[in-house]
Amino acid sequence: MKNLIVYYSYEGNCNEISNAIKGVINADVLRLVPKKEKITKSLFRFVWGGVQVYMTKKPELEPYKIDLSQYDNIFIGSPVCFGTYAPPINTFLSENKMKNKNIAIFICSGNNKRNTYKNFEEALKGNKIVDKIEFVYPIKNGIEEAKYRAEQWAIDCINKIN
């Protein structure tokens, strides 16, 4: 069974968690990168993110090549953006219809996941959600502990599948 980690990272949190997961399972990694992204530390990022989410935007992504039929287990990671997964994940899920996959979801949030898991489950109908985990401000609140949790969680997910 082949493993894939697909993630989007805005501030680096999901990147750190993805790297931790990759460190303990044999997985290919696909980092989603929007062609036009407004990276900023100002409050404008909330305006940009809010507009993207509420208008259900699907930003164009940098080209990637991935054949999802080659993977049985897919770990999907996203920051929480206005109570749901980030718009680049929306693009990926709309462009790549998955069925009969084992899916593990990791999110990085500011402690307000609201409908994120529910929205993932709706977008991923026809797949098995193996497990879900949330990391609250992992870089800010202690990245080493978050990485350890991610590693243990990834191992548990693989054990549940096997």
Q: Whereabouts are the PLM-identified features?
A:
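N-terminal beta1-alpha1-beta2 submodule of the flavodoxin-like/Rossmannoid cofactor-binding fold
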Residues: 1-76, 83-84, 90, 94, ...
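A generic structural signal for alpha->beta connector loops
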Residues: 2, 24-26, 100, 126-129
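Solvent-exposed loop/turn segments at secondary-structure junctions
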Residues: 11, 36, 81-83, 110-113, ...
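Short, conserved loop/helix-junction motifs that constitute active-site signature segments
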Residues: 68, 94-101, 124-125
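Redox-cofactor binding/interface segments in oxidoreductases and associated redox assembly factors
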Residues: 76-77, 105
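"Short basic amphipathic alpha-helical interaction patches in structured regions
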Residues: 89-93, 118-121
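Short, glycine-/small-residue-rich phosphate/pyrophosphate-handling segment
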Residues: 104-145
